[in-house]
């Protein structure tokens, strides 16, 4: 099927993918723009997974001060090369992540960063609450697992729903940018400040 050049251009603007990738996705989707976006997203996730093992030693420190000066965020975002660290898309991602941190107050980057004692304590509290409600031990355990998953979504940046599109997580947002930029990207650390806290 011949693909309209305007459609290719529209898809490219929507996704940031290359012209040939957009053309190929549109051909695969028989001209369906929404399906082509989905195809590119799936390919992007596959690309991001391949790049995830590569070392990130370059990057930037991004500072964000929220309007009114009451909330501030310092973020270290790493990439593979200094060329990418100066890229506008990379800077845009740093700002989006800083906005997320300012709004949603995560405490850790990934679930692996949460100290074991904290996880054990949260699980214990959830189990005890379920038992106090009269739930059997095996049910209390399942409830505790569910509450721990919810806890991770609240305190881990990568697991939080993105504030501008709650259908994707911050980890998925980072993977989209990895696919667009073509390099591994990692949030190394962050610090959120709030006046009076």
UniProtKB/Swiss-Prot annotation:
It is found in: Cytoplasm. Residues 81-84 are annotated as: Involved in Mg(2+) ion dislocation from EF-Tu. Gene3D superfamilies: 1.10.286.20, DNA helicase RuvA subunit, C-terminal domain, Elongation factor Ts, dimerisation domain. Transmembrane segments: none annotated. Keywords: Cytoplasm, Elongation factor, Protein biosynthesis. It comes from the Bacteria. Belongs to the EF-Ts family. NCBIfam families: tsf (TIGR00116). This is Elongation factor Ts. The gene is tsf.
